[in-house]
């Protein structure tokens, strides 16, 4: 690994702010893999597809909170669920004014809600297949938007556990090669040692 992004999960806001400040303080001083910036995964997600995120800290989109997260110029990407109130407006503001990338995930959004956020500047679907509604022929939802839009990245946890090999092949055969991102999603709960 040469570059990585420390990632927060849904937590009390003060813990998220503290994590951002800590990364800002040390990101240019480490003699190791380069920290690109921070990825804020939650708290602006949906309870139905929260995954490992604690439900009690899931929040509505809030301008003041996001502005505070951006103060250190350390946050480079944030997840939002596109069904959140005013999500397209927030997406445009975050991407254009704050210059932070918006990814969509942990969501129950329908296709139209997802496309509205992609149209406003969101550029990726996070954990494709996971923590979202599954593809349905009458409601292709967020997954359908990720698969059919060649202007957005599909982030895929390609560990063979989160997503089956045939499902990975379906996605990779339907996305331009430069729009598929393979990621790890390892957290302490995997039981693996550091590294």
Predicted regions mapped to residue ranges:
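Divalent metal-dependent hydrolysis catalytic cores, especially in the metallo-beta-lactamase
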Residues: 1-19, 33-46, 72-83, 100-101, ...
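Short, small-residue-enriched loops and turns at beta-alpha junctions
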Residues: 11-13, 46, 52-56, 84-86, ...
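Charged helix-capping and loop-helix junction motifs
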Residues: 19-22, 61-63, 137-143
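Extended, charged catalytic domains and RNA/DNA-binding interfaces, predominantly
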Residues: 68, 76-82, 87, 91-132
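Conserved phosphate-binding/catalytic loop of the ribokinase/pfkB sugar-kinase fold
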Residues: 46-71
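Active-site-adjacent C-terminal substructures of enzyme catalytic domains
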Residues: 113-195
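Short helix-capping segments at alpha-helix termini
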Residues: 27-33, 97-99, 175-176
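Generic structural signal for hydrophobic
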Residues: 1, 69, 94-95, 117, ...
């Amino acid at each position: 690994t040469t570059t990585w992004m420390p990632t927060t999960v849904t937590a009390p806001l003060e813990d998220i702010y503290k994590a951002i400040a800590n990364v800002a303080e040390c990101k240019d001083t480490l003699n190791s893999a380069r920290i690109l910036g921070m990825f804020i995964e939650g708290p602006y997600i949906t309870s139905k597809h929260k995954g490992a995120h604690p439900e009690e800290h899931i929040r509505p989109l809030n301008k003041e909170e996001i502005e505070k997260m951006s103060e250190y110029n350390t946050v480079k990407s944030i997840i939002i669920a596109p069904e959140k109130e005013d999500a397209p407006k927030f997406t445009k503001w975050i991407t254009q004014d704050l210059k932070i990338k918006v990814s969509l995930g942990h969501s129950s959004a329908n296709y139209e809600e997802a496309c509205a956020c992609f149209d406003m500047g969101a550029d990726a679907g996070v954990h494709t297949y996971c923590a979202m509604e599954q593809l349905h022929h009458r409601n292709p939802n967020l997954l359908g938007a990720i698969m059919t839009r060649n202007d957005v990245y599909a982030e895929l946890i390609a560990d063979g556990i989160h997503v089956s090999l045939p499902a990975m092949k379906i996605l990779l055969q339907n996305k331009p090669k430069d729009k598929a991102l393979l990621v790890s999603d390892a957290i302490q709960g995997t039981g693996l040692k550091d590294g």
